[in-house]
Structure formats: C-alpha cells, structure tokens
C-alpha cells in the first residue's frame, strides 16, 4: 500500500481527534489502516462509547447512520456515500407499518442492516451476533423479524417456543452461495470445517460446522484445532483470519461471496474524507430519537 497515504491518514486522524472504524468486509487496504475493525455489533458499541470528535466509518450507509444515531454529538463521515446495502433497501417504514397493522401488538425485531427510518418503526434491533439473545429477551410469543428472512429462520431454530413473521428480505451476496458450491469445496477439502454466516440460505447453514457472525468466526477459527476452514461469508473476512492465524488455511466457499458496496471504499477515499471532513451522515432528530430507542434496547440485552 502507499505509505504516503497511510501516513497522511494517520496524521489527519490525530489532527481531527478522529477514530477510523472499518467493517470486517472492507478491502484489505482499509482494514489495514483502521483503528478498530469489527462486525456491526462491535462497531455500534465503539461508536456509542468513543471519545473521538469525528468517526470515519468505513462500511455501508446504514452503519454510518447507526453511528450518527448513537453519537449525535460526533461528526460521522462515510467516505463513500454511494456504499449502500441492497438488503436494507428491501424494507421501508410504510411497508413495515402495514405489516404491524396486520399483527397488532407484535414486537418488531429489526436487523441493523436497515435504514434509520425503519429502525425508528421497530421495537428493538439486533445483529447477527446477538439476534438469538435479543429475541429470547422478549416476553412475547410472536415476533416480526425484518428484513432478513435467512437470519430470521436461523434464529427461529434456536427459539422454537416463539412464532416468527418474516419480512422477505435477504443479502444478495450471501444468497449467491449455493449448496452445490459448498459441497464441491467440502469434497475438495475433506478435512476442512465449514463456517458460514446466518445470512446464508437455510440449506447452506444446515451444512455448516458453525454458523455465526463474523466476530464469532474469528474466535471459532482461532480456538479450533482444525487446520483448514471453508469460509462462507464475504471475502473481506479472509484478511484478518489469515493475519491472525498464519498457520491455518482459509478457503472461500464461493467466488460469488463478494459485496460490491463493501469494496467501494479505498485508502484514497478515506484520505479525501479526512481532508474535507465530508461526506457527513446525519439523521433527522425525530427519527434519530426513535431509532436510538431500538438500538439502546439491543445494547441493553446482556452479552454472553
């Protein structure tokens, strides 16, 4: 990577009292310069507690929105404003309200992969790392789960005493991974463990030795005695897995596991963002306060 750019970024971060957060799916070059890398839950927690004045969020739009919701006194920068999330765009507030009218009194559990407006119409948020705990924390026997039907189905298996009403959304990247691709890799690497994300289709997660969030994948692969792992989530995770486990082999389950939005942000974009302190992501106060309730309820659920 360009050391000159990295040095400029580090200097500007210091100058602006800024923190650089990067999601686990970012390009290698972006993860390399981040102060903190993590999944949506870890980065939400960091955004809520940071003492920095500026948060540079290397991820997609809904993540920067969540940071702005949790830290309204901070300036939140998203180096690529065009880094969106197709799954987040599959649910809107109007549609969610219509579903709520059909099921009055049923709480809405919304995956953080959603817009601020959708969060504002939800009772509680969740991430892939805490979705099961969040649902179990509710006293209700029925829940509306949006927008990811695959994560919802995964959680439902762990919470058989509750009835789920699913919004019909999905992650296009994880949806592209097929059973056939997984079986082919398992045949090619018979000793390897297959680890996948619960955003994968149920038929794929059924083949997994472990289905979990990206943060849990790091822990699982680090602690496992296995030497080979077939990884069923976005390719960006391989950077840190290989960095932290140089004696282990990580094989991407499918070349289709590539999110174009997560790959938009470059070091040059980060540098430009820090030089100009743009683009700023903000959330209207009325929406922010309602969305913050749903996020705060999630963050209040006890962690393992």
From Swiss-Prot:
Cofactor annotation: [4Fe-4S] cluster
Stored InterPro entries: NadA (IPR003473), NadA_sf (IPR036094), Quinolinate_synth_type2 (IPR023066)
One of the record's GO cellular component terms: cytosol
Tree of life domain: Bacteria
GO molecular function: 4 iron, 4 sulfur cluster binding; metal ion binding; quinolinate synthetase A activity
Top enzyme category: transferase
Keyword terms of this UniProt record: 4Fe-4S, Cytoplasm, Iron, Iron-sulfur, Metal-binding, Pyridine nucleotide biosynthesis, Transferase
Compartments it resides in: Cytoplasm
Binding-site list for [4Fe-4S] cluster: 85, 171, 259
Record-stated family: Belongs to the quinolinate synthase family. Type 2 subfamily.
Function noted in UniProt: Catalyzes the condensation of iminoaspartate with dihydroxyacetone phosphate to form quinolinate.
Record protein name field: Quinolinate synthase
Species for this entry: Pelobacter propionicus (strain DSM 2379 / NBRC 103807 / OttBd1)
Organism lineage string: Bacteria, Pseudomonadati, Thermodesulfobacteriota, Desulfuromonadia, Desulfuromonadales
Gene field: nadA
